[in-house]
Amino acid sequence: MKKIQQLLMLSLISSTLIACGGGGGGGSTPTTSSSPQSSSPASTPSSASSSSIISSSSLSSSLSSSSLSSSSLSSSSASSVSSSSVAASEGNVVIEVDMANGWRGNASGSTSHSGITYSADGVTFAALGDGVGAVFDIARPTTLEDAVIAMVVNVSAEFKASEANLQIFAQLKEDWSKGEWDCLAASSELTADTDLTLTCTIDEDDDKFNQTARDVQVGIQAKGTPAGTITIKSVTITLAQEAYSANVDHLRDLAPSDFPIGVAVSNTDSATYNLLTNSREQAVVKKHFNHLTAGNIMKMSYMQPTEGNFNFTNADAFVDWATENNMTVHGHALVWHSDYQVPNFMKNWAGSAEDFLAALDTHITTIVDHYEAKGNLVSWDVVNEAIDDNSPANFRTTDSAFYVKSGNSSVYIERAFQTARAADPAVILYYNDYNIEQNNAKTTKMVDMVKDFQARSIPIDGVGFQMHVCMNYPSIANISAAMKKVVDLGLLVKITELDVAVNQPHCDAYPANKINPLTEAAQLAQKKRYCDVVKAYLDTVPVNQRGGISVWGTTDANTWLDGLYREQFEDEKISWPLLFDNNYNDKPALRGFADALIGTQCTNTH
């Protein structure tokens, strides 16, 4: 039987063990979570071997981080957990788990639990019975075989008096019989009201944790007839495997002709992945990018939720952060039809079409004026996704409040561009849309719109190709041809929202060709696809017409695609479309992007 090693903490260990800030630091108002979660009945070893003492200096040395910082491990579900820090040490990756997000109560069999409570001290649960504890998730494709879990815990005097034991465990989610149950700390090894570090090595004979298809539930539970409470002060997980490195120092520095290499980020729209508070997000953004797009907070419903009530606080903080870190900002988006992003006062407009257009003028002028004065915002998606997906394509009609309230007319599109130009003569104005890279009827409609604008002197500087593509569709030939049509119009071409979905319900013969788990072959194919797309951009768009390339997100754990296709994916998170994995580690896709920038041949090999 494995023994759990313990450390008597002489004092509260300093921040070398737990990074400050991130996806939820100490000092917040305590909250509770009591979501039930399935669990297999954990075995109860008859005895626990005595533990050796680890010195505080050796533990601090082995777990301290010299780089990177706080953020989240997995996606936005309540059952996912944030990671405060990840650091590489002697070939291993150390995950320091967020103690203010992502935990839940857990119980075996029919035993009930009362959830968990967050506090400045950590995560606390009441030991109501055998198998009651607290758990968090480690998201796929992280593998935990041979990983070492270290938990700093503090048991109450009542728990110590109950002579109950503590057990660290790990389970494959939705396959509850597969778990690590051999780590037990006997009551004799526990001291009341004293911080103790318990460690457990996940080491199963059948390597059941050497998998990437399932999330893993990690936790600690009381065994025996417990009473009292247990507080978990901190958790670190040291992974055995060395993280993949793309050997890219700074992606932004590889771009020819100094065009921007950008990324879309979350802000106050995502507490877990907020760039302003998540230091792991900050680390990867600072390392590789020089141009930022706010995923949501500069859209209309955030900026003017009610008529005349403009809210610049969150967007200003975002722009300020970009400025402080020498990054420019692309504004997204002044006008977008999506129902949840249109303020109710516009959706319910009862006045005339001209009054509605005047209200639109007010919104655009106020926003653009504000950021012209503030500085560092260099371009806007003026109108986003105004063309439908029909063949032949046309402007959106009944599904766009802007079309309907403008008198069942697309006049709002040109009006938006005219108003934005009047507000800021220097800012770059883009029309932005998806699927126009397919060189299809939608592309044709976009080109016709631009030609009409140019003929009538409606100001437009460029076209944003969102570029949400699959592994094989659309073809590089069609992507290049679509961009060439905009080049021939003399406009800037900007890839605004690039991602490459490993799985996508509408292409690559899904679900017949569904990929799960994420294999090395799939990652290398994605590497080549990123390279091919970026190379097509460089080959097609002249230097003076390049608006730059932005990726739509940092980590696979925070991609919009898994939410969009949740039903088709049957709640699996299997799109894996970005440059960094769930733990912010490099993926081969990053290498592929870099290869294209420096002119290296695109391959599906390392």
From Swiss-Prot:
Enzyme Commission designation: 3.2.1.8
Start and end residues of each stretch annotated as Disordered: 23-64
Compartment(s) where it occurs, according to its Swiss-Prot or TrEMBL record: Cell outer membrane
Binding site for a carbohydrate: 106, 171, 217
Record domain GH10: where: 245-596
Family matches, as Pfam families: CBM_15, Glyco_hydro_10
Stored SUPFAM superfamilies: (Trans)glycosidases, Galactose-binding domain-like
Reactions it catalyzes: Endohydrolysis of (1->4)-beta-D-xylosidic linkages in xylans
Induction notes from the record: Induced when the bacterium is cultured on xylan or beta-glucan but not on medium containing mannan. Is repressed by glucose.
Signal sequence range: 1-19
Any one GO molecular function term: endo-1,4-beta-xylanase activity
Known function: Endo-acting xylanase which specifically cleaves internal linkages on the xylan backbone, releasing xylooligosaccharides. Is able to hydrolyze oat spelt xylan, the arabinoxylans from wheat and rye, and glucuronoxylan. Also displays very low activity against xylooligosaccharides. During the xylan degradation process, Xyn10C may act on the soluble xylans and long xylooligosaccharides products released by the secreted xylanases Xyn11A, Xyn11B and Xyn10A.
Protein name: Endo-beta-1,4-xylanase Xyn10C
Phylogenetic placement of the source organism: Bacteria, Pseudomonadati, Pseudomonadota, Gammaproteobacteria, Cellvibrionales
The encoding gene: xyn10C
